[in-house]
């Protein structure tokens, strides 16, 4: 069978799904202890009884959650040589109408490489996700935005991490001065949506939250046409 599952395994999964939906919606935590505590996250070691009666030890990274900013420049580009779009050919005008996405490039030690990413950061204690999004965009890029909309909310890696990410769409951008943290060395650049989508699909962009945001915008733009 697919994925090497036997009929019994399929039956067991079906029982777990049914029990999760009707009898046991969450695991019963039998014991929990903090096995690591750091400035950004902690780790708990939990003894649990999960849906279907499975008992297991789970090490879970605990995180306060993060935000991601999909900052879009809809006034993509005025032509420095000719501001009269009425006399520009239709293909050039179409290119001008394409939105641009603000990306950051920085070194990521865990990935051992430079990465293109959307602006993002952790939600501090006492902050709302929107407040954190506005703060991170300004700190990392120097931009502020007049329009904000929450578009996506998801778990990063729910097998061992409880962190969620919320992506905000930011429009009406206004340039300012970046205020990065001392250990942040960030370069920023605008990419046309079509180019950013190619980068997401050909592997040049390898960051999951960034790929999610870019493909959301590409799909939304396509549906609006």
Regions found by a protein language model. Name each.
Residues 12-37:
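Extreme N-terminal tail/first-helix region
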Residues 23-24, 58-61, 79-135, 139, ...:
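Conserved Nudix-box catalytic region and its N-terminal flanking loop in Nudix hydrolases
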Residues 197-225:
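Long hydrophobic alpha-helical segments typical of transmembrane helices together
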